[in-house]
Amino acid sequence: MARICKVLIVENDRYVRELLGDAFEDEGFLFDTVENGPAMDEALDRDDYDIVVIDVTQPGDRDGIALAENAHAQGCGVILTTGDHRHVERLEESGRHYLLKPFKLRNLMDVVEQILTLASMECVRRKHRDGSRFPARGG
């Protein structure tokens, strides 16, 4: 049975948070939404997420790039979003997936698929390194 992907959306703009939630729901993903870093930390402590979508501009002392480090450390794929083009250099240096607002929801889903594909490939590599073998072909 295939495992369903779970997404956490960290966005302080309620409208954008709801729009992203609707997009993930339409694509069949499970999702939760929170509006800031402390709420993200609580959600990550409470539940397991495959992907975290984080707006770079956040209230408080940690921006989205700092929040991404925490999410990544917990094994989540991360997508950063921003409407401020001044963040592009830092986003590129972070090595994380990112999208500049406004973006097409299809582009977001394409990045989600890339992350899930990479995670699946890493899982196969890990099993292979650990001595697991693929079943023999034929019969």
Set out the residue ranges of the language-model regions.
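Two-component/phosphorelay signaling modules centered on CheY-like receiver
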Residues: 14-32
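C-terminal output helix
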Residues: 103-115, 120, 124-125
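Hydrophobic/aromatic residues positioned on beta-strands within the core alpha/beta folds
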Residues: 79-82
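As written
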Residues: 90-100
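CheY-like receiver
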Residues: 118-139
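Conserved phosphotransfer microenvironments
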Residues: 55-72
